[in-house]
């Protein structure tokens, strides 16, 4: 036989041998059940339909992935390139564990926002956001004036909240944050404390040519040797309004012990005043936030640092509440101001935060809250209030999380989609001619499955996040400043005090 016939026979033998080995030793005939969802969670087509595209001066949600490399190389900061955003009437909630990339998104949002020249307020608790922007010349490049409020930095811009108060209602709201009722049992102490504190504020203002600060009020209160002498001073030398407040406090309770406890609660609230730097920074103002935020191209950074939060958490909440109140009162006199509150849960509880968020929709204050978990929000505000805060945020973004409660929460928000389940099994069957063969049985049926299963939320990769808006959900490529823009440098300094030290070192050199 010709040689090629041997080759053909050899190939045939090898094929039959492989089929025999595969069928008898390799092939897995165990039953299988696979699910094929009608839609993948990475499909952003539906989400894109409800997001705005090409608007300037709206909160960034994601970049347009269809922009060509040529256009990106010509415009790396995307100054003229369209992005996906949401209306300035919206509020957003961003959830993700530490290190998941939330700060990268904040920086990307700020860079995109600065294209519009509109002002913004950003909490910077690490701190690093102001430092990265300033070190890389971004604030100067976009022509922004910055105000850095850091109560524990001696070189920080000083700010006295009372300088921007316009009414009794403004003062009362701040006192609610400064002296909240922590429980039903402590409500009477808080009420009395607020009356005495308000009387003291008005007393100091009336005796200091209209000037008053937390520092001067604290100094006045501790200068009185006892609660009796404080009340006597207010009642004897105060204005009619001060006397009215003292009388109201005395009618509320005639117990000297109760008064002493209430005043002690006021003094305890001012424990942060034992820090001389904080006392100095709260005593006067370098800027009026009310006037500054009416202007374009102003960036305010609230640097209430994480390692000092045990001391300054009440001050942090006080400034957040104060800024929201200011922006509500001057809304008709300004453009949109973007509020970015990172690690809001590190501060003290802000009373009626959910109601406030529902109100600000029409006040030109797009607001994004950044937190580490839904569980933390519930722990801080309670289940009912936490649910209201989440509901007040029309857009939710969730990075990888570590707790199953948050993962299940966002999975449920995404809803379910139809899926085809294909079941496959193999069973031995005898043919008509008596041969034993394996018969494959396939069945198909439809069922509902989670669009984004909880386990996916626990395993999201870096740079990925779930976005939920107007009933649509998708896993998106979340904007990252260091990857998507030329802003790749770190921070050479993080506080105004660091900047002064660098300048002094350079001058010596």
State the predicted function of each range:
Residues 1-10:
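Feature marks short, highly hydrophobic, charge-poor N-terminal signal-anchor/signal peptide-like helices
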Residues 9-15, 99:
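Membrane-embedded transmembrane-helix bundle of lipid-linked glycan/lipid transferases
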Residues 18, 22-40, 71-78, 83-365, ...:
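P-loop NTPase motor domains
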Residues 35-51:
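Membrane-cytosol interface motif
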Residues 48-81:
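N-terminal pre-Walker A segment at the start of P-loop NTPase domains
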Residues 57-60, 196, 418, 437, ...:
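Polar low-complexity intrinsically disordered regions enriched in Ser/Thr and small residues
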Residues 60-63, 102, 199, 421:
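Residues at secondary-structure transition points
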Residues 357-359, 363-466:
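Conserved ATP-driven motor cores of ASCE-family P-loop NTPases powering translocation/secretion/packaging/pilus
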